[in-house]
Design a protein with these regions (language model features):
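N-terminal cap/lid segment of alpha/beta-hydrolase-fold proteins
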Residues: 1-24
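Catalytic nucleophile-loop/oxyanion-hole region of alpha/beta-hydrolase
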Residues: 68-95
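Short beta-strand element of the alpha/beta-hydrolase
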Residues: 27-36
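Primarily recognizes the serine-hydrolase "nucleophile elbow" in alpha/beta-hydrolase
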Residues: 89-153
Length: 265
C-alpha cells in the first residue's frame, strides 16, 4: 500500500498524492488517475488502478484535487480552472515517460482539458500520452449537467446566495457554487472537434442518471481520431464499481498500456 505524500510547490493548496506500482526505469507505460467531483483518490476505481499498476509493475500516480480527500483547501473554493492547473502540474511534475490517462466523471473532462492544453502548449509532454480511458465522462458538466438541468428555484438560490446545496445519491449533499459554474464557461469543449492521435476508450453505463448515455455520445461525437470507441455497459450506473465493471475497466486500461509497450495479442 502506497503512503500518501504531499506536494506543496503550487503555493495554493497542499495536494495529497500516491505513487503505486513499479519504477519508471522499467520503461513500462504508466497510469495517471483523475477522479470525479467530490471523489477521493482512495475510492474503488482509484484503488483498482493502483492494484493494476502493482500487478503489472508499472508506475501509477493518483492525487486528490484541493478540497477533496486528503488534500488541503475548501471544496467550495474549487473551480475547473484550479483543478485543471493542479492536474497539469501533477502530470508534468510527477510523471515521466509514456502514460495512459484514466479519468472518471469530472476527471474525464479534466483529462480532455489536459490533453488540449498540452497539445497547444507542451508538445513534448503531449507526445507522452499514449491513450485515454474515460469513464462516464462529465464533459462540460457545469453547463450541460448542472446549469441546464437546474430549475428556477435552484437558479434563484444560486443568484441570491452564490451557492446551491445539491442532494447526492452517494452520501452527503454537496455545494455547487456560482463561482464554479461561471468558471466552467471558460472550459467548454463539446461544440468544437478535438482530434486525438492516440486510442480513446469511453466506458458508459446505460443506467447512469448523473451522466446519461446521450451525454457520453456528445463526447464521443466531439472527438476525432483513428481509434476512438464508446462501450455501453448494460445496467451500469454512474459508479461502475461492481467487481465485473471494475474488471472491465482494468482490462480496458491494460489493453492500452500493453499496446503502448508494443505487446502483441
Amino acid at each position: 500500500m502506497a503512503n500518501t505524500v504531499y506536494d506543496d510547490s503550487l503555493g495554493t493548496s497542499s495536494l495529497a498524492y500516491r505513487i503505486d506500482g513499479g519504477d519508471d526505469e522499467l520503461g513500462l507505460t504508466g497510469l495517471f488517475w483523475l477522479g470525479g467531483f467530490k471523489s477521493a483518490m482512495t475510492g474503488t476505481k482509484g484503488e483498482a488502478m493502483a492494484d493494476l499498476a502493482r500487478a503489472t509493475r508499472r508506475r501509477s500516480l493518483r492525487f486528490d484535487y484541493s478540497g477533496h480527500g486528503e488534500s488541503a483547501g475548501l471544496f467550495t473554493d474549487g473551480t475547473i480552472t484550479l483543478w485543471l492547473e493542479q492536474s497539469v502540474h501533477m502530470f508534468l511534475r510527477h510523471t515521466k515517460g509514456k502514460r495512459v490517462i484514466v479519468g472518471s466523471s469530472m476527471g474525464g473532462w479534466l483529462a480532455l482539458l489536459i490533453v488540449k492544453r498540452l497539445q497547444a502548449e507542451d508538445p513534448s509532454a503531449f507526445r507522452r500520452i499514449s491513450g485515454l480511458v474515460l469513464i462516464a465522462p462529465a464533459t462540460d458538466m457545469t453547463q450541460d449537467l448542472m446549469w441546464d438541468e437546474f430549475g428556477e428555484n435552484e437558479k434563484q438560490e444560486l443568484a441570491e446566495t452564490g451557492a446551491y446545496v445539491r442532494p447526492s445519491g452517494y452520501g452527503e449533499p454537496y455545494v455547487i457554487t456560482a463561482k464554479l459554474l461561471a468558471d466552467g464557461q471558460k472550459h467548454l469543449i463539446l461544440k468544437q472537434p478535438l482530434h486525438l492521435p492516440f486510442p480513446v476508450r469511453i466506458l458508459q453505463g446505460t443506467d447512469d442518471t448523473d451522466v446519461p448515455v446521450s451525454h457520453a455520445i456528445k463526447t464521443f461525437d466531439m472527438l476525432t481520431g483513428p481509434d476512438i470507441t464508446l462501450s455501453l455497459i448494460k445496467g451500469g450506473d454512474h459508479r461502475l464499481s461492481t467487481p465485473a465493471q471494475i474488471q472491465l475497466i482494468q482490462e480496458t486500461v491494460l489493453n492500452l498500456v500493453n499496446r503502448a509497450d508494443g505487446v502483441s495479442f
